[in-house]
């Protein structure tokens, strides 16, 4: 799987990924290929993937989860900046309309925790204040993510002091 991610940084990456898909047609191979395809640092690829996450997905929870796992890369922070806000805009609907398993996978993969910034924490805390207790999984997930993000911010602040 790691070699597929590495391929994306090489010349002829798309052809190499296609060859890997032919070489390993198993479920594991399909999931690895989806992670790799969604990891492409291209705005159109990210937009199409986000819409699929919100819509029909990639055919199954496992394949969709794999694709979501390839979406966020810390080295793509500028490209992914709009999706931090979109996460908060879409979260309530995801938790209201989708299965528990999907909602949890969506949150774990797409919460913008790679952006260890006070602004993201503040936005997440404000959002938490608006979430109904009728969505306990979302409330709990936000509390846990906020705690993790706050610890990461404090660690970075300490490291630079």
Task: Locate each region found by the language model.
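Long, ordered, helix-rich scaffold segments
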Residues: 4-161
